[in-house]
Amino acid sequence: MAFRKSNVYLSLVNSYIIDSPQPSSINYWWNMGSLLGLCLVIQIVTGIFMAMHYSSNIELAFSSVEHIMRDVHNGYILRYLHANGASFFFMVMFMHMAKGLYYGSYRSPRVTLWNVGVIIFILTIATAFLGYCCVYGQMSHWGATVITNLFSAIPFVGNDIVSWLWGGFSVSNPTIQRFFALHYLVPFIIAAMVIMHLMALHIHGSSNPLGITGNLDRIPMHSYFIFKDLVTVFLFMLILALFVFYSPNTLGQNMALLLITYVINILCAVCWKSLFIKYQWKIYNKTTYYFIIQNILNTKQLNNFVLKFNWTKQYNKMNIVSDLFNPNRVKYYYKEDNQQVTNMNSSNTHLTSNKKNLLVDTSETTRTTKNKFNYLLNIFNMKKMNQIITKRHYSIYKDSNIRFNQWLAGLIDGDGYFCITKNKYASCEITVELKDEKMLRQIQDKFGGSVKLRSGVKAIRYRLQNKEGMIKLINAVNGNIRNSKRLVQFNKVCILLNIDFKEPIKLTKDNAWFMGFFDADGTINYYYSGKLKIRPQLTISVTNKYLHDVEYYREVFGGNIYFDKAKNGYFKWSINNKELHNIFYTYNKSCPSKSNKGKRLFLIDKFYYLYDLLAFKAPHNTALYKAWLKFNEKWNNN
């Protein structure tokens, strides 16, 4: 007798994997089970290694995730494998369940097998929810609050159960820590349930597409179905690797899983009364099944339903449809805190510099150029400009070289990249919206390269691949790139081109452009009190990655920095009193902005002037009140 059959432990492996008799007619839909086992192993292994570096404390969770992504060797691969593996886990599980529904795998004598699978499905969803809440993920605190509040529907004791789950009066540190503990524990319970699932499967064996007993024609699992499983395993690993390494955040959308899904799966095993089995022999049932699957595949977020009705004409007037369905609606050109989201000034398209250095003589962005100086910029060179412009306005241009380089480096940080092709030459690519074509055209005039329309999307791409242009571009942005991933690429390109790599400069009041905050992630609003607005407030939200930069501005301008739990772990810096606003307003006079938020900033001094006059509550029919209404309309229009 073979050793694999005589050994106590190997005989179990032999009966389940090697000599297990399988129907010869099963197709590739039966490969989903082996893929689910692979997904479970990937999730457990990557989860264990990430847990070695992750901290579940609410104050450290976000920082520990950043630590995994930046400092842990291949930590970003672990995290993306875990996140995308979870998405593929559910995809394969849904296909596995669809196969069971289509081929009637829930019927007797496999009722226990089906019910154990439903329990595994529920535990998997619970594990995914706990994981989303741990690291300020998709659901975050809001999702944890909503889902746990479902228990409040239980009569009499519902609210007490919710408080017990939270460990307090709201989702806080105890909640996240216990969620992480359960997120670590439940996968091992799932693994135990998988063993029970295999035990139930081993009793009656697999079903088959024909719907008849498979005992008439069975073949051993090895080597026939083992190699058949390996085909889908390699295909699965290839597709998973494509998402992990090339598009790791594509599958990060929320998935709404309804309770009715569990009920249907459980009732399928007890409600089937037909003498005939399997949908493939029933035309009407088969058609209905395909309609259900098509409906699930076409399900989208609620706002996308606007396209399916005649509401489009009504929304077009408010420009809502274009915003909802713009793929870049929440994407800034670059996300670094010291760079700004801006368009190149159209009036400077033919402006050139006679100097040999790579720095521009005048600012080429909409923040550093006022309209009344555009004509002068196009006629006079910098020497004549210095004689004409007063000292007050000259401060606008004195740091233009640094600002242009930071702005260009910001493009590369946010939506462009450096790369080396086959260790032969370096290249740089930048992608922007169509309306910003002039911006790329001016970069093309300065450094060379090509500008082309991207197919399939409303975007335009700048590409630079010649050595001379790359040397000029690198010298222009060297020391200004702050994104860690781009720094790695930038360093490799510098080595290839024999250029000294410069570390990112530290932000100061002289070399950082503060107005960029308010276009990318800052607001300038008014607080309301009744009908009159009390005071303006300026707010910036950043992650802990940029906290040290914001702390510098707190030292310069004052204000407060606090941790906002409701905004996915962001730090907020805000100033909201007249003295600090005056300091901030005076500083930004040298950095004019044409963005809507920048226009509001320069209305602050007028706001305080009018508000001080209105302090005595003038009657609403006076000229002073009418002046206030006129100012209010101007503020809203900006």
Curated annotation (Swiss-Prot):
Keyword Mitochondrion: yes
PTM comment text: The mature protein may arise from proteolytic cleavage of an in-frame translation of COB exons 1 to 4 plus intron 4, containing the bI4 open reading frame. Cleavage would take place close to the Met-385 resulting in an active maturase of about 30 kDa.
Family, as annotated: In the C-terminal section; belongs to the LAGLIDADG endonuclease family.
Location of the region described as COB intron 4 encoded in the Swiss-Prot/TrEMBL record: 253-638
Subcellular localization: Mitochondrion
PROSITE patterns linked: CYTB_NTER
Family matches, as InterPro entries: Cyt_b/b6_N (IPR005797), Cytb/b6-like_sf (IPR027387), Cytochrome_b_N_euk/bac (IPR048259), Di-haem_cyt_TM (IPR016174), Homing_endonucl (IPR027434), LAGLIDADG_dom (IPR004860)
Main location: mitochondrion
Note: Residues 385 to 638 are sufficient for maturase activity.
Top-tier EC class: hydrolase
One cellular component term from this protein's GO annotations in UniProt: mitochondrion
Function: Mitochondrial mRNA maturase required for splicing of intron 4 of the cytochrome b (COB) gene, containing its own coding sequence, and intron 4 in COX1, coding for the related homing endonuclease aI4. In vivo splicing requires in addition the imported mitochondrial leucyl-tRNA synthetase NAM2. Both proteins seem to stimulate the intrinsic ribozyme activity of intron bI4 through binding to and stabilizing specific secondary and tertiary structure elements in the RNA.
Name of protein: Intron-encoded RNA maturase bI4
Subunit comment: Forms a ternary complex with intron derived RNA and the imported mitochondrial leucyl-tRNA synthetase NAM2. The proteins do not interact directly with each other.
Source species of the chain: Saccharomyces cerevisiae (strain ATCC 204508 / S288c) (Baker's yeast)
Residues covered by region (COB exons 1 to 4 encoded): 1-253
Its EC number(s): 3.1.-.-
Entry's Gene Ontology BP terms: Group I intron splicing; mitochondrial electron transport, ubiquinol to cytochrome c; mitochondrial mRNA processing; mRNA processing
Domain of life: Eukaryota
CDD domains given in the database record: Cytochrome_b_N
Annotated keywords: Hydrolase, Mitochondrion, mRNA processing, mRNA splicing
GO molecular function terms noted in the UniProt entry: endonuclease activity; RNA binding
